[in-house]
Amino acid sequence: MQYNEKLDAELKALEGDMIETLQRWIRVPSVRAERSAENAPFGADVRRALDTAMADLKRLGMEPRDVDGYCCDTEIGEGDEVIAVLSHLDVVPEGDGWDHDPYGAEIIDGRMIGRGTSDDKGPGVAAVFAMKAILNAGIPLRRRCRLILGCDEECGMQDLEYYEQKIGLPDRGFSPDANFPLINTEKGGLKLALHAALDDARLIEIASGTRVNVVPNQAVSVLAGDWREAAADAFDVDDEDCALESELVDGNTRLTVTGVSAHASVPEKGKNAAKMLVHVLAKLGIGGAPIALLDEAAGRESAGEDLGIAGSDKVSGALTINLGLLFAREGKIDVTFDCRYPVFFNPETIGETVQRRLAPAGYALEPIKPSVPHHVPESSELVSKLMDVYNTITGESAKPFAIGGGTYARHLKEGVAYGMMFPGELELEHQANESIDVANFVKAARIYAYAIVALCA
């Protein structure tokens, strides 16, 4: 890789605009909702985020194309071959526990705070301004670089499925939606939804979780009668980040367990409030076999050992499982797990094992629809060039690695995830107080600019 003084000068000149643009994007609470119009399949706020992004692309001299509200795209460069850069505008719900406005985009002590700063509006804006700097620097590209900004990455990627059917996806590219240096392997993804009858009149309700791909940081249960003292005795978690609160309301006890949210691909980084609540209920003897077995089989770890599905391979590492959604009411309990499984594992076997483990308590598993694992060899031209850019700019000698998260990259025949979180950096995606280091945001844009030049020039 060779440095380009003109490109670096353009990147420097664009820094202020880049930061202000990200703040503008963050201030739109683009959480998926029901279709609100023909061109708003994911709700009005997501549509507003798309309009905001397209307006900025036009302002910067690019020509965005609206793909029926599912996403937008824009290109720079010439030639028949296309390299894709895939980012997304939708975010997970903000949840509780924020110290600042989750959509305020405040900059405090060098960090911009807000939902979407790291996942994935920040990386998207960095890619936009990388492309703008290349345009301003007048660098000719023999391949086209196509930026695609999606609107449904967090809830199943229907946006890219629609795009692929209507437009068609390039074969190669990267998604700035994870970590540097580079991720060439993504585990398979599996949603395991189970249901069982619940025969205990004392258990009025359980509610925990907003999305299956988030470790729930709050869990609430309502019990008939006064269970305040017994519940306090049953809560055996010694952690300042976790708590149990109880109150008597109209003769019933409302229990609220607080934990710490995290991305479901790294459940060990969170403290699962749903599992803590299940453990309390099991110790109280409430909920019968469905609660007792759930606590025994899934309430104590996140590697799948107690469910009988634990394991790993050399390519992608260990299986993880997150109890992401837990609801009970009117004699029924609904449990949904997010499982990230290694490349060489069979998802059907995982589902069958979980069903067998929980069947004694009456649980039935819905049909599974796995997201298959994804792997790009380290020896590929794509990986080699992107790693060269990263290592040259950072001075490191880093190697690619695997993650449990699923990014847009898996939709490409040869796609990888590439930043924008740096090694050792504070990672707060899907958590309260999500934020990014502004200096690293600027640094990532520089890496993306040189990466696009390396792949397309």
Language-model segments: residues:
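Generic non-transmembrane alpha-helical segments
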Residues: 10-17, 21-28, 52, 56-60, ...
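Acidic, glycine-rich active-site loops and adjacent beta-strand->loop/helix elements
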Residues: 89-91, 145-155, 177-181, 210, ...
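Acidic/His- and Gly-rich active-site-bordering loop/insert found
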Residues: 2-115, 139-141
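An extended, acidic, His-containing surface patch that forms the Zn2+-binding/catalytic region
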Residues: 65, 227, 265-330, 336, ...
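Predominant activation on well-ordered alpha-helical scaffold segments within soluble catalytic domains
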Residues: 23, 54, 125-132, 161, ...
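Midchain, well-structured core segments that form catalytic/ion-binding scaffolds
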Residues: 154, 160-342
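Active-site metal-coordination/substrate-binding segment of hydrolases
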Residues: 82-149, 155, 167-171, 431-434, ...
